[in-house]
Amino acid sequence: MSQTKPVYASFRSIGAYVPSKILSNADLEKMVDTTDEWIVKRTGIKERHIAADDEYTSDMGAKAAKLAIERAGIEKEDIDLVLCATVTPDYFNMPSTACIISDKLGIRNVQAFDISAACSGFVYLLTVAKAFIESGMKKNVLIIGAEKFSSVVDYTDRSTCILFGDGAGAAIISATDKKEEGFIDVHASADGSYADFLVTPAPGAINPASQKVIDEGLNFVQMKGNETFKLAVKTLTKDVKEILAKNKIDSGDIPHFIPHQANYRIIKAVGDALKMREDQVVLTVGKYGNTSAASIPMAINEIWESGRLKTGDLMLLDTFGGGLTWASALLPFAGESVQR
């Protein structure tokens, strides 16, 4: 009796895009009651990129995706699933941003849909892509994390406007028969009892579009900062310890720990709890801020373009976001290294 050969999901390429406009801490000093010193001390953020008025989530996602496709060495016709993680879609509920990105890339008659898992979105997509590929249903999955967070930020609220930036990252996840190229583990979870920690109240079924929404600023992101900080450190640390223990991998053996880039103090606290060396921890929050679902792929792209990420290198991804959601992944980089 013939035996079906196992199929594994592999991380084949990465791409990213950031808008050209930079909003510095000095700029924010002129807009709200804050200082560069305070922002850097509390968050580690020095600047963030902001999309133009006529530049949308789908535009940024399509540009990142185009790079990922080119770097994977495949054609757009080879893609059989398009997934987008975003909480700042082009449209409130339909069409999906994944469908719009597919159209902008010229990808036709291919399944496409969005997921909403806030900052955990990209790693959530890895779980979906893995399931589709290892079931044999798909061979090349385009995953995108893209956000125009400036569209839901109140630039008179100093507690949130200092944190967020815009951008996009994308990857090609492909089928392979080589176990050493395949994902080692991915994990995602959620707890809706903390839903009010991070929320954009409107528009939605609870707060439909109305004058009240505009007057009360319900269309802007709201955040319980202190509570979110404490829970993020606790949850991220626990999640990483569990995935490492499950797979019998020591934290010191991870060359690239890529956490969600929300806040330097969160990243440092988690890194310290895991006894990670500074050279293991990837940091991009200083120049991009929190780009939500785009954060992790943008960070991966940063170390790939610099030549730091090599073929076969192990990546540990860890993220936490509104929902509340959290996710982690252990996987090798199966793409080509940058040639220098």
From Swiss-Prot:
SUPFAM superfamilies with a match to the protein in the record: Thiolase-like (SSF53901)
Domain of life: Bacteria
Subunit structure: Homodimer.
UniProt key word Acyltransferase: yes
Gene (name only): fabH
Region (ACP-binding): 261-265
Domain notes: The last Arg residue of the ACP-binding site is essential for the weak association between ACP/AcpP and FabH.
GO BP, sorted A to Z: fatty acid biosynthetic process; secondary metabolite biosynthetic process
PANTHER family: 3-OXOACYL-[ACYL-CARRIER-PROTEIN] SYNTHASE 3 (PTHR34069), BETA-KETOACYL-[ACYL-CARRIER-PROTEIN] SYNTHASE III (PTHR34069:SF2)
Subcellular location: Cytoplasm
Function: Catalyzes the condensation reaction of fatty acid synthesis by the addition to an acyl acceptor of two carbons from malonyl-ACP. Catalyzes the first condensation reaction which initiates fatty acid synthesis and may therefore play a role in governing the total rate of fatty acid production. Possesses both acetoacetyl-ACP synthase and acetyl transacylase activities. Its substrate specificity determines the biosynthesis of branched-chain and/or straight-chain of fatty acids.
One of the record's GO cellular component terms: cytoplasm
Alphabetic keyword roster: Acyltransferase, Cytoplasm, Fatty acid biosynthesis, Fatty acid metabolism, Lipid biosynthesis, Lipid metabolism, Multifunctional enzyme, Transferase
Active site: C119, H260, N290
Disulfide bridge positions per record: none
GO terms assigned for molecular function: 3-oxoacyl-[acyl-carrier-protein] synthase activity; beta-ketoacyl-acyl-carrier-protein synthase III activity
Predominant location: cytoplasm
Gene3D superfamilies registered for this protein in UniProt: 3.40.47.10
Natural source organism: Sulfurovum sp. (strain NBC37-1)
Pathway this chain belongs to: Lipid metabolism; fatty acid biosynthesis
Name of the protein: Beta-ketoacyl-[acyl-carrier-protein] synthase III
Signal peptide (residue range): none
Family: Belongs to the thiolase-like superfamily. FabH family.
